[in-house]
Swiss-Prot record:
Protein name: 4-hydroxy-tetrahydrodipicolinate reductase
Catalytic activity: (S)-2,3,4,5-tetrahydrodipicolinate + NAD(+) + H2O = (2S,4S)-4-hydroxy-2,3,4,5-tetrahydrodipicolinate + NADH + H(+); (S)-2,3,4,5-tetrahydrodipicolinate + NADP(+) + H2O = (2S,4S)-4-hydroxy-2,3,4,5-tetrahydrodipicolinate + NADPH + H(+)
GO BP terms, alphabetized: diaminopimelate biosynthetic process; lysine biosynthetic process via diaminopimelate
Physiological role: Catalyzes the conversion of 4-hydroxy-tetrahydrodipicolinate (HTPA) to tetrahydrodipicolinate.
Lineage of producing organism: Bacteria, Bacillati, Bacillota, Bacilli, Bacillales
Binding site for (S)-2,3,4,5-tetrahydrodipicolinate: 154, 163-164
Species per Swiss-Prot/TrEMBL record: Shouchella clausii (strain KSM-K16) (Alkalihalobacillus clausii)
């Protein structure tokens, strides 16, 4: 039985993670960490009808009193690194779904994980289909090096481009030499019209109500194009990946960035 604490239970992703932990026989949800509602029970919150699970606002106190195995952090980019550091201090393995980590953050957190001999997972996207999309895009980039990424999310998302888009670009860059795309004399008549630049690739971010999480990787070649697309239609689509991450993190002794590293 894996003892779990969820940070950010009232968010859309957090609510799905709570349902996952309550229905999985091998998971035990021992507490949740929220920005408010300290001392209440989960089932007493507006978003939930069940769950005899205590609510904390102090993560360190929560860990000290319940000694969980795993933290599932689904809060906001501003809190991800701090929550991971608190988890390491208490011997807890973090599974983090927030984005916005810099390369320096990843390096520092990897050192902390290895010093504590604890597993940790940061997942820009938990959807298995999205992970496959990234892996397929990396394979395609070996043969077609003209590529642009279009990602679409709901209009409440704080960061742009998305962590999934950045991770996709990073994977492509591993097999593709930097290349400036478009005409050599190309100019933007409006700033930002061509999107963000990553090694010459362009990343375009769309934010609209009614969207959840969508990404298309577009490749162009002589006389042909290739499109690789993934759509998450609801947040339940992320839960198989969350389950996989929780099951795998207890077997690790370092930080893994991206679920693609856990899928053969």
């Amino acid at each position: 039985m894996t003892r779990i604490v969820i940070a950010g239970p009232r968010g859309n992703m957090g609510q799905e993670a709570v349902k996952l932990c309550l229905r999985e026989e091998s998971f035990e949800l021992v507490a949740v960490v929220d920005s408010k509602n300290d001392g209440k029970q989960l089932k007493g919150l507006q978003e939930f009808q069940q769950g005899d699970v205590p609510v904390y606002t102090d993560m360190a106190r929560c860990f000290a009193e319940h000694e969980p195995d795993v933290l599932i952090d689904l809060t906001a980019p501003a809190f991800g690194r701090k929550h991971m550091e608190v988890a390491f201090e208490h011997g807890v393995r973090p599974v983090v779904g927030t984005t916005g980590f810099s390369d320096e953050d990843i390096r520092d957190l990897t050192k902390l994980a290895e010093a504590k001999e604890l597993g940790a997972i940061i997942a820009p996207n938990f959807a298995i289909g999205a992970i496959l999309m990234m892996k397929f895009a990396q394979t395609a980039a070996r043969y077609m090096n003209d590529v642009e990424i279009i990602e679409q999310h709901h209009d409440r998302k704080l960061d742009a481009p998305s962590g999934t888009a950045v991770k996709t670009a990073q994977l492509i860059a591993e097999v593709r030499a930097p290349k400036k795309q478009g005409h050599e004399q190309e100019r933007e008549e409006m700033a930002g019209a061509r999107g963000a630049d990553f090694d010459g690739m362009k990343i375009h971010s769309v934010r609209l109500p009614g969207r959840v999480a969508h990404q298309e990787v577009l490749f162009g070649g002589v006389g042909q194009t290739l499109s690789i697309r993934h759509d998450s239609l609801n947040r339940e689509s992320f839960m198989p990946g969350v389950k996989l991450a929780v099951e795998q993190v207890v077997k690790l002794s370092t930080l893994v960035y991206g679920l693609e590293n856990l899928i053969d």
